[in-house]
Every structure is written in C-alpha cells, then in structure tokens.
Amino acid sequence: MIYSIIICAGALLGFLILQKLLAPKDTRPPLPPGPWRKPIIGNLTDFPPKGTPEWLFWAKHHERYGPMSSLEVMGQTIIMINDAHLGIEIMHKKSALSQMIPDAPFAHMAGWGMSLATERNKQAWKTIRANMKQEIGTRRAIATFHPKMEIGIRRFLLRTLDNPDDLRFHIRKEANAFMMDVAYGYTIAPHGKDELYDLTQQSVRQFSHIFSPGEWSVNFFPILRYVPSWFPGASFQIKAAEYKRTIERMTMVPYLWIKDQVARGCTRPSILLRLLQKGHYESGSHQEQVLVWTNAEFVMGGSDTTVSAVSSFFVAMALYPEVQHQAREELDRVVGPTTLATFEHRSQLPFIDALVKEVFRWHPASPLGAPHITQEDQIWDGYLLPKGALLLPNIWTFTHDPSVYHDPMVFKPERFLERQSSPPETDPMKFVFGFGRRICPGRFVTDEKLFLIACHAISCFLISPKDPGAPEPDWLPGVISQPGPFDLNVVPRSPAHEELIRSIETDHPWKNADATDISQFMARNQMI
C-alpha cells in the first residue's frame, strides 16, 4: 500500500501546489475543527488503527473538537457528526440536502456495485428500495411473515435448549433461516453442511470488511484500481477478486435455482419468485442484476442486524437480572407463565416494548451510520459543510449522549416508559437505522423479531453469565458490530417450560431441507 501512496502522492503534488497558488481566496466560513492536516495526504493517517472500535475512536473527536469535526484526505472533506441533536437536524430534517451515495471504488471492484450502499444509478437504487419497501418496508407487510417468524423462533428455542453453549451459532442460523425462506423459499439444513447458508455467511463477513472506513487505499486514490495485482502494495486487487467471486455466487445461485424450479414446475412462494413473475429479465441484463440484488440486500442486511441485536439482548439480560425479572413478571401477568406471547400482545407489554428500544440504544447494530454526501454548501453553527463532503454520523455517540439519555451507559428500559415525573426519552428508532431515503428498509424485520425472541426467551429461559463477576464484554469493530465473547448460562425455567419448548417438534416438524438439492444444482452448474 505504501508504494501506491508514494506514486500517487508524487503525481498529485504538483497539481495540488498549483491549485493552491491559483485558487481565489476563500471567504466562506471555516470547516469544523479537526486534527492537523499533513501535506499532500491530509488526515490519511488519522483513521482508527486496525482492530479498534471505530465509534469509540471517533467519539474522542467529540471530546476534543465538539459536536462536529472534520478531516481531509486528498481533497475529500469528511465531517464526523457526534451529536444527536445536530445529527437529527442535518441528516433527518434536512436529509434532502445530503442524499447522495459516496463513491466506493473498492466495493465496485469487489462486485458490490449494485448494493444499496454503493449503487449510484438513481433508477436502479429506487427500484431496489421500492421492491424492498413493498415486501418488508412496513409493519403491515411484515405481518404476512409473522407465522414464519413464530415457527423459526420456536425452533431457535429448541436448538438453544439442546446446545446452549452454541447460542451465537443458533442466533445466526435462525436469522438466516427466516430471511432465506422468505426471500427464496429455501429451507436450510437443521444440521450439517449447507452450501447456500455458508455462502451467505461468507458474504456478510466480507461486507463488513469491504465497507470498513479507511480500510482500502484505492478509496482515497481511485487511480490505484488500474494498478496490477503483482505491483507492490496492490494486494487489494487480489482481495477484490476473491470477494467478487463470493458475491457473484451468493446473488446468482438462488436466482438461477429458482429459475430452474420454474422450468421444472416445482416452485414455492418467495419474494424472488413474485418479482420474477412480474416481468421479463434478459440474462445478464441490468434489470436482472437489480432483481437479484433486491433479494441479496434483504437476506444479508436483515440477517446481520438481527444477529447483532439479538446477541446484545442476551448479554443485557445476563448483566441486568433485575430487568430480566421485571420483563418476565410482565409476561407472566399478561400472557401467562406457560404461554408464549404473540405479536398481538405487544400493545399490552409496554416494558418489553421499552426493552427492545433499549437494546437498540444500548449498542446500535451499526454504530457508525451510513455515510451521506452533501449536495450543496451548508452552514451549521458557523461552520461550513461544503458540497461533496462526506457526512459520517456516529450513531453510538447519539445513543450515549447524556444530554439525550440519562445514565447512557446503563441498560434501563424504563427510560422509554410514560411516567408522571418525566416524559419518555427519545426513541432510538429515529436514528439507529439511518436517515431519510437511506434509512434501513428492513428495520421492521429486526424490530419485530427482537420483540418476539425477547418474549419467548425471557418466558422460557433463565439467562445469566457463567462467570457471575464477568464485566460487560467488548463490542467488536465493523460495519455491523456484535458483542465479543461472553459465556452465558441459558437454562429452562422449569420442566413445564422445557416441555413447552419441545412442543415445536410435534407442532411444526422440520420440512425437508434444500441443502442437498442446492449442492447438486451448484455442482451441475459448476458453481461450487
């Protein structure tokens, strides 16, 4: 990487000096404060070190520079927003002024050019979002999937009962099983190898690496995309090719599998099938790519945020037993001690509803929000946000701002309840899933699944840390963050609750899985 930077820096040095000499004097307000810009490279070395939680690194800017800070890398201005009030004003109320998607050369090289995070073709972007909004973008749309959610969550309880030490694996499996069933009509293997499930997991892991801020030199020096992979410092070319192979298989395998089912006359309901039947898609066309990426976004985006939220929920219940007890008391009183809640109970369970909000606030799934680009010069608090600046909202600082949330480091669901002494605190749903037209279209999936998992897990299990004195775990860095290792005891409340969990085996026995069929299909078409 250093060789590539030196080459580009030398080529740009003369241009930047000339530009500085010839540029007219700028009479606009100053940029927000920030670290000193080094010659040529600016703040290229001021990004978080590898392995550092990005949101905590940027939160230090709040302490040093105030609610907004700025950096500059090779002429690209970056504005960090670390204040909840300011973030809502700039990115929500004035969202029309910063809706553009930032360019991400490495993501395009890695095959993610059609992702909602990078797609700059307005029509394609609108089509993907419109498809997702129609299928999962409202609570009314999500209600059609409630039966699938309920069955999947009960199976999750059973797997957790049988193998509680593999809780994180069960959380991931349940999240992906639901998404793949709804998107593709695909039934994952309850045990053993599943090629499509593994491919989805690999794509999700690579997503976090691809979109990690400051990770790839080519994002700062786009000309590097033309450097051959054998050139010193160009190992990103090899990674891009590897990631591209993965995402091409992940997007195309289920699509071609469903087309094969259509040809054989053995289809089953799915989002992809419904969209496929609405139009004609030429092989290799842009319209076909829009179609397959609609479903890829649904499967990967919804599953990863759900995994993060549910993992954080279990950690919170172990660390705050008094909250777990209060939630269980409400469930026993409203629903019954040996009855599982349904979505219809939510309006009668205010503490559980508040608990779900507190999970989202306590540790947002995406602690750094999706970046936006300003479409015109803006002035805020006497500082300039120039046209073309990259806006990065630090969602974690929004949800841990003591001027917005009392005792922000403490898990307190009651902060969202109606009380005579004080009004409820700000609903974190206002910002934890993004802003404006770039808000996460799958947010209601994560919200409703977390609600039902919380209800069922608290009703059926006693959750505690294996080490009673264990501190709160560290949260792992990444675009989607999850709690680090934290061993839990998850045991049934009573024999009656164990029997309730096991009733899923007779109420809804496993259907035949599609793992063998998809493996054979991939082998026939040389996709493995």
UniProtKB/Swiss-Prot annotation:
Question: Could you tell me which Pfam families the record lists for this protein?
Answer: p450
Function (record text): O-methylsterigmatocystin oxidoreductase; part of the gene cluster that mediates the biosynthesis of aflatoxins, a group of polyketide-derived furanocoumarins, and part of the most toxic and carcinogenic compounds among the known mycotoxins. The four major aflatoxins produced by A.parasiticus are aflatoxin B1 (AFB1), aflatoxin B2 (AFB2), aflatoxin G1 (AFG1) and aflatoxin G2 (AFG2). Within the aflatoxin pathway, the O-methylsterigmatocystin oxidoreductase aflQ is involved in the last steps in which OMST is converted to aflatoxins B1 and G1, and DHOMST to aflatoxins B2 and G2.
Q: What is its EC number?
A: 1.14.14.117
Q: Which UniProt keywords apply?
A: Glycoprotein, Heme, Iron, Metal-binding, Monooxygenase, Oxidoreductase, Signal
Q: Which residues are glycosylated?
A: 43
The record's annotation in CDD domains points to: CYP64-like
One annotated GO biological process: aflatoxin biosynthetic process
Q: Which InterPro entries match?
A: Cyt_P450 (IPR001128), Cyt_P450_CS (IPR017972), Cyt_P450_E_grp-I (IPR002401), Cyt_P450_sf (IPR036396), Cytochrome_P450_fung (IPR050364)
Changing residue 400 to L does what?
Answer: In strain: SRRC 2043; loss of activity
Q: Extract the signal peptide range.
A: 1-23
Q: Which biological pathway?
A: Mycotoxin biosynthesis; aflatoxin biosynthesis
Q: Does the keyword Iron apply?
A: yes
Q: Name one GO molecular function term.
A: iron ion binding
The encoding gene is aflQ
Q: Which residues bind heme?
A: 440
Q: Which family does it belong to?
A: Belongs to the cytochrome P450 family.
What protein does this entry describe?
O-methylsterigmatocystin oxidoreductase
Give the protein's cofactors.
Answer: heme
User: Which intervals of the chain form a coiled coil?
Assistant: none
Q: What is the effect of changing residue 143 to S?
A: In strain: SRRC 2043
